[in-house]
């Protein structure tokens, strides 16, 4: 890899790690069992991808993250999202398995950073909208806030993946997005 690629991937990973550290510092205590349970569920959802086109995959992890955002808040959600990027196991077409320990480190770090950054920033948007607009859980406007959360997570996730692919392979962002 070229030095600029390594530098950009390091910066990308560093931002994700900083956001995760911020979540750990600001995390309000929840039972360790709850945290482990949701980490397991998120890792399981990430391990069961749905292929809808060649090399195009979607998982239901976003639904788990929305559930956590509504019930536990941004910091807990980001911790679980980061763990989902690490604790997954996918069986490939040839019968082998893909997991954190047999992928190149830069792919694992990019996936980790992508999940962390998109969950954290989307969670901050959710918190901002709920707090500043004074929207309660029972408000009909909550549907709009949830839609904004989904949209922000989707856009951030896909843009970050496209940027990562641009850094690694040099392919245009628009083509990979």
What are these regions (language model features)?
Residues 1-42, 46-63, 71, 75, ...:
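Membrane-embedded alpha-helical hairpins and interfacial helices in multi-pass inner-membrane proteins
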